[in-house]
Design a protein with these regions (language model features):
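Divalent metal-cofactor coordination and adjacent catalytic microenvironments
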Residues: 1-149
Length: 150
């Protein structure tokens, strides 16, 4: 299994102005450092929580299907863009995003998944994860956690 970031977040969940207010910093001398700290704090929380704060696109590669239901390792998942087996896209109607806390996909018809012909990485699942496109979409407790780490 490998997980690759295809499209990263367009913005950070915490603005430079919010971080500077929290830190009680005036002026612009430390702006680049503070912006770096905001990104580092977000990345740390995302890695520890297996989540995406701002909308991102990911590709999950598998050697074989783990079962009839596939858990996606990052959430919250808003959409599955496509599923490829040996480079060929499955029809969107062939699978569903299972609702619930953990992001999972399953075959819509409960049929078995088509097996890849190769030995490694023959399955690719592209999906969108994140609370939304803006920092205001991120839950307040995560916003506050970023400020505390900064």
């Amino acid at each position: 299994m490998s997980l690759t970031l295809i499209t990263g977040p367009a913005t950070e969940p915490v603005t430079l102005a919010d971080a500077k207010l929290h830190l009680r910093v005036d002026g612009t001398v430390e702006d680049a450092l503070i912006q770096t700290l905001i990104s580092a704090a977000r990345l740390t929380l995302e890695a520890h929580g297996n989540l995406a704060m701002i909308n991102q696109t990911w590709a999950l590669r598998l050697d074989r299907w783990p079962g009839s239901v596939v858990s996606l390792p990052i959430g919250p998942v808003s959409a599955v863009q496509a599923i490829f087996v040996d480079g060929i896209a499955l029809a969107n109607e062939a699978y569903v995003l299972v609702p619930g806390g953990e992001a999972r996909i399953a075959r819509a018809d409960n049929a078995p998944w088509r097996a890849p012909s190769g030995l490694a990485g023959g399955i690719e699942i592209r999906f969108d994860a994140g609370f939304g496109p803006e920092g205001t979409d991120v839950p307040r407790h995560l916003h506050h956690a970023i400020l505390m780490l900064v």
